[in-house]
């Protein structure tokens, strides 16, 4: 660990994509209570003390040459010295839905280069006397994954509830933790898995296309979520398998497809040697593509999804990973589909972030809801589903680009999947 280090291979790729508006990571905390902007800024300052990545900026050094696009780039590095505070902007707008426009704008606006952290925050409220506040967090995906996003939200809420207790907490890391590649064993590759091209959702009429990432949110409350967890245990599968299966079956009913590729985010902290502390802040993921037949019922499909993902991770992680620069084979097989399908790189992506640790009550504040999203305008899957557990319930955020698929299509797919999982759409 040190006061500076080069970005790892995946951090470098994600930072590069961020500069073009790709995979910008967002979350929104919907908070009830009289939240003073100065207290929120104190919380952001404290987060920087706790997490070295948050008190670092990125510099760009010598040239690196490659045989595939981009053929040349400057080597990026995290540097702690000289980094400024996390910027906080306050928006007062009488429109109760103004936070959605802030979210949409941030999702297509990369964080500028310079000596600021790779995170920015906007506090959206109707007025200075409002009881409901929306804390919109925008991050460079090179510095944050879903687990880190939940941790940031949890730590910030804990500070707001009791600043003195939070300040007494010792940081997990005193300086920058290592990149993924430094501690990860070589990715398994049997050599028997050819490149798997994406299977995309069919194009449907799009009467009002708009370059804007949007989110449809659904929540399974605790009683419905408990029934789902019991069924998952009985059927020997996972929450990821169940959520993916529900959306696959919804796709089959709506489009008549009998197979589909799925992008799945995998947390790799525990696979590193030595294993990273579970509260290490940063981006420690891979994204794997698997091809899944769509047949049978919810639970049969869920078990098949889980089996294919586990076997791919164990045997063919290297070839199944999409978190790497495209080579010429990928360009040959994917460029036409990306162009003809409104810049979609796949049909579905599913991330299940596990238990967030977030609760409703935080001293004088109440966490009313949480929204999570990833920018999909420049490119991405048709649907990006993020599942996270909170206070016994399960939150589902279904992201999509309004330039690629209509709200009516996404709502129909989300409601179908949600109903299969035991949710109540009425």
Annotate each language-model stretch with its function.
Residues 43, 132-133, 213, 228, ...:
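Alpha-helical hydrophobic/aromatic positions enriched in membrane-embedded helices and signal peptides
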Residues 156, 160-164, 251, 309, ...:
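Short, well-ordered alpha-helical segments in soluble proteins
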Residues 30-34, 91-162, 166, 175-183, ...:
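Histidine-centered acyl-transfer/condensation active-site motif
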Residues 69-88:
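Structured interaction and signal-relay segments at domain junctions
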Residues 31-52, 137-154, 218-256, 396, ...:
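Acyl activation and transfer enzymes in specialized metabolism, enriched
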Residues 1-67, 72, 96-119, 252-426:
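Acyl-thioester-dependent acyl-group transfer interface
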Residues 1-15, 22, 91-93, 143-230, ...:
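Non-catalytic, low-complexity flexible loops and terminal extensions
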């Amino acid at each position: 660990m040190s006061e500076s280090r080069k970005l790892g291979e995946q951090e470098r790729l994600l930072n590069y994509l961020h500069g073009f508006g790709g995979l910008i990571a967002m979350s929104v905390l919907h908070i009830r209570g009289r939240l003073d902007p100065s207290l929120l800024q104190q919380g952001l300052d404290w987060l920087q003390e706790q997490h070295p990545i948050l008190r670092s900026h990125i510099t760009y050094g010598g040239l690196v040459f490659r045989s595939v696009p981009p053929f040349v780039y400057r080597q990026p590095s995290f540097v702690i010295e000289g980094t400024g505070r996390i910027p906080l902007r306050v928006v007062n707008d009488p429109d109760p839905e103004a936070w959605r426009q802030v979210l949409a704008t941030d999702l297509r606006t990369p964080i500028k280069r310079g000596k600021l952290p790779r995170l920015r925050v906007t506090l959206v409220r109707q007025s200075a006397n409002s009881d409901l506040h929306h804390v919109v967090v925008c991050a460079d995906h090179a510095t944050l994954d879903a687990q880190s996003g939940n941790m940031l939200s949890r730590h910030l809420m804990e500070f707001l509830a009791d600043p003195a207790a939070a300040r007494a907490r010792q940081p997990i890391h005193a300086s920058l933790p290592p990149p993924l590649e430094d501690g990860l064993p070589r990715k398994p590759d049997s050599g028997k898995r050819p490149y798997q091209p994406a299977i995309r959702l069919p194009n449907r009429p799009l009467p009002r296309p708009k370059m804007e990432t949007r989110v449809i949110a659904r929540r399974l409350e605790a009683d419905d979520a408990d029934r789902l967890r019991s069924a998952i245990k009985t059927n020997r599968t996972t929450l990821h398998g169940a959520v993916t299966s529900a959306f696959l079956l919804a796709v089959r009913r709506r489009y008549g497809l009998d197979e589909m590729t799925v992008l799945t985010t995998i947390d790799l902290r525990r696979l590193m040697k030595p294993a990273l502390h579970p509260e290490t802040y940063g981006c420690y993921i891979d994204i794997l593509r698997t091809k899944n037949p769509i047949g049978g019922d919810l639970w049969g499909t869920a078990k098949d999804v889980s089996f294919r993902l586990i076997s791919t991770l164990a045997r063919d992680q290297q070839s199944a990973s999409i978190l790497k620069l495209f080579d010429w084979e990928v360009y040959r097989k994917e460029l036409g589909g990306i162009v003809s399908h409104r810049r979609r790189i796949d049909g579905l992506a599913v991330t299940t972030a596990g238990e967030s640790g977030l609760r409703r009550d935080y001293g004088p504040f109440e966490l009313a809801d949480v929204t999570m999203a990833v920018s999909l305008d420049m490119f991405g899957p048709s649907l990006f589903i993020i599942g996270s557990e909170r206070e016994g319930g399960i939150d589902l955020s279904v992201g999509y680009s309004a330039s690629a698929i209509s709200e009516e299509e996404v709502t129909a797919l989300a409601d179908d999947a949600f109903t299969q999982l035991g949710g109540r759409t009425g």
